[in-house]
Structure formats: C-alpha cells, structure tokens
Regions:
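C-terminal catalytic lobe of FAD-dependent flavoproteins
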Residues: 2-88
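Short amphipathic beta-strand starts and helix->beta connectors
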Residues: 5-9, 154-161, 206-216, 252-254, ...
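Cofactor-binding beta-sheet edge motifs in enzyme active sites
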Residues: 9-29, 35, 57, 134-136, ...
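Hydrophobic alpha-helical scaffolding
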Residues: 20-24, 38, 57-62, 103-111, ...
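Acidic, proline/glycine-enriched N-terminal capping motif
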Residues: 51, 67, 71-207, 212
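Conserved, structured C-terminal
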Residues: 114-123, 136, 223-408
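Well-ordered mid-protein domain cores that form the structural environment of catalytic cofactors
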Residues: 192-246
Length: 408
C-alpha cells in the first residue's frame, strides 16, 4: 500500500484588492488594518491588538485572534509560533463553576468593621450585634444578670438617673464644604436649612423622590461654609451616593464639595443628667461648655485632654441632657477609657444599641426599623417638619393624600 501524503497548508485569506476582508467582526478590523499596523512598525501581537482594537470586544478575541495571528505571520513571512499570541483572558480560559458560586467558609471572606471602642467593649463582655458590616455593642451584661432585659433595663435606668456612654461611631459622617452648601441642603432636606446659624445643629428629614422617608439625622454648621452631616448607620452609603447624584446630576453649578469621614472620627454619645459634669472633667479649661455658652443644639470645635482636637454637639436622642463628642479615630479607644475613668464618681455605665433604642422610642424619635423605605413623614409623626415654603426632593409626591392617611 502506497501512502500519499496530503499537501495541506493554511489559507488565511483571499487577496481582495480594494474590497474589505474582515478579521474581527465585532470591532470591524480588516486584513488591511493588520497589514497597515505591521507597515507602521507594530510587529508584536500585543501592539497590533491595541493599535487596531483587534480582539478587544466582548469575546476577547475568541473568534478572531487565530485568524489575525495567521494573517500577521503570513504578512511578515514567519510562522505563527514566531508571531506569538496575546494574553488569554476570560472567557477564553475555562472558569470553574465553583469560582462563581463559591461556598461559605465561615467568616473568612466576610468583611467586618469594628468601632474604636471594640477592644474595650470586648473586655467588658459586651454582646455584639451585626449592623451592616459593623459590630456594635448590644448590651453589657454584669455578673448575675441572666436575661438581656435585666442588662438593658439597668443601662436605661442608670443613664436616665446619672450618665451613660454609647459608641455611635457607626453613624454616617459627611463633611460638606462650599459657598452653596446651605442652598444644597435646603434642596435635599424636607425641612428648612437655608438659615442654620454657625455653631448650631439641626435635625433633618430626607425624602426620596416618591415622598417616602429616606433617612434622618443631624447636620451641624461648623463655620460659614462648612457643615457636618450625620446619617443613620444603615443608610450611610446610600445617603452619600444620593448626595453625590444630587450634586453631579441635578445641581452641578452649586459650589459644594463633600467627603465621607465615617471612619475618620470616633464618636460617643454621653447622655444623662451628669453628662455635662463628666465632659467638663476632660474638656480643656479654655472651652466653655456651660449651658449659657453651649446651649441645646450647639456645635463647635473643642480640645480635650490637653490639646487634642475634637468636635462637640449638644444633641440628645435619649430625652436627657446629652452630647456627642467626635475625635480622630486613632484616639477613639483612649477617649472611651478616659471617659469611663472620669465618670467613676457618677457611676457611669456603657450602654448598647438596645438601651439606645428604648430611650429613642420613649422620647418619640423614629427608630431604625421604622425607616424601612415604606414609611412617610406622616407615618412617623413628622408631617409638621415638611416645609411648604420651598421646593425639595420628594416635595410633590410627599404631599399625596394617600401618604397622609392615618390608617396606612
């Protein structure tokens, strides 16, 4: 038997004269484009790829690159092996389904965020709860307390009768600066913000475009063109994204600049009848926080513990005399320990999110579960906050009679 060898050779294209011969159908790359790239000095496959956009469409060259390499090799009078290939990218290289689906591996791949007082709270045997990615102290059980209600009731009673401290670092914090910040805030909040005095804080209600409550929180005017906004923990990211959208897309002509500083500041609520006395022990003497100098809803820059810069806000979500003090995060753990030591004579206690919720509800504030994306300002008893003297996001749809119905 005689074996006749086949004379097979690659045929990469038919000379077409002036007609176009397509190589990459997705990016409209032709044989002429590849030859032109070679003529202009692009000999490497990677260079030709970027010069012509060959293989840079959704298939990443899966349907065109072999043909293109053959055309290049033929044009330069060399083999395909000498010409080389581009770097393989998905979906050219098979990917295991497990890489997409994955599997639970405990907490290995779960992102976590810890408050500055986390180590101290752990030392106090705090019970933690996941709030978004944060771990927050839920309550602080003492020896002999066998039920969480015992701990929470004690924390509430002690805070109301003397003083308690709660880590509220997880609240969103946004620094906003610019000549038009007042006008900007007046457009995003349902209540008036155009004339907030310097050194004052105002509670604000923010609505979505459909009139449903998005978030609530306080915003302090630190100077003429500098405001500090706080948001709820759960909505810190969504509110910041909302503000960016409002500025960039709705009112780009306003002079407004903002940045999230949630992780840059540790913040503690100091609440109770003795809260001012406790703070006076750590606030530097030149900073007057008396009732006359620092009244309700005041805000200002202070120094503590011999010159450490801090921010102080006289706001209360507990129904008692209360303050919130913010300090650079690196001092957060130390400040918690200093506050607890300074408050020993007042029998200061730490309180967690459960006691915070109890006191917030008893005062009549909206609690976290009520801001669930389904409630209106009227559902929360805040219909009176909606200004009728200005336009703002959610104004028109927020006044629908259906949202004001008492039996919703």
């Amino acid at each position: 038997t005689t074996v006749v060898p086949y004379n097979i050779s690659a045929h990469w294209g038919v000379p077409s004269g002036k007609n176009r011969a397509w190589v990459d159908f997705q990016n409209d790359v032709t044989v002429k484009d590849i030859k032109l790239a070679n003529q202009e000095g692009f000999k490497s496959v990677e260079h030709v790829k970027r010069y012509t956009t060959l293989g840079m469409a959704t298939d990443q060259g899966k349907t065109a690159n072999v043909l293109a390499i053959g055309v290049m090799a033929e044009n330069m009078g060399q083999t395909m092996e000498d010409t080389g290939t581009t770097i393989f990218r998905p979906p050219y290289v098979p990917v295991a389904i497990g890489a997409f689906a994955g599997r639970r591996r405990g907490m290995e791949f779960y992102p976590t965020r810890y408050t500055p007082s986390h180590n101290w709270s752990t030392e106090q045997n705090a019970i933690f709860v996941e709030v978004g990615m944060w771990y927050r102290s839920q309550w602080f059980p003492l020896p002999g307390e066998t039920h969480w209600r015992q701990s929470v009731d004690r924390e509430v009673r002690q805070t109301r009768s003397s003083v308690g401290i709660c880590d509220v670092t997880t609240l969103g914090k946004i620094d906003i600066k610019g000549e038009d910040v007042s006008e900007f805030l007046n457009k995003v909040y349902a209540n008036a913000f155009a004339k907030v005095p310097v050194g004052k804080t105002r509670y604000g209600l923010m609505l979505r475009e459909d009139g449903i409550v998005m978030d609530d929180g306080t915003t302090a005017r630190m100077s003429e063109n500098h405001f500090v906004m706080t948001t709820t923990t759960a909505n810190a990211v969504s509110v910041y994204r909302h503000l960016q959208f409002c500025h960039q897309c709705l009112w780009p002509d306003l002079d407004v600049h903002m940045i999230s500083v949630t992780e840059q500041y540790a913040q503690y609520a100091v609440a109770g009848p003795n809260s001012r006395k406790l703070l006076e022990k750590i606030v530097d003497p030149e900073c007057d926080i008396s009732n006359e100098a620092f009244p309700y809803m005041a805000a200002g820059e202070i120094t503590v513990c011999g010159g450490t810069a801090a921010r102080l806000f006289r706001i209360s979500f507990s129904g008692e005399l209360a303050y919130e003090i913010a300090i650079p995060t690196r001092y957060g753990d130390s400040l918690m320990r200093v506050l607890m030591e300074a408050g020993e004579e007042f029998n200061v206690i730490p309180y967690g999110t459960e006691a915070l919720g109890v006191m917030r509800i008893e005062k009549g504030h909206a609690a976290g579960p009520e801001l669930n994306g389904q409630t209106s300002a009227y559902d929360l008893g805040m219909g009176g906050m909606i200004s009728g003297k200005k336009d703002f996001i959610g104004y028109t749809l927020g006044l629908r009679k259906e949202l004001q119905r008492g039996d919703r």
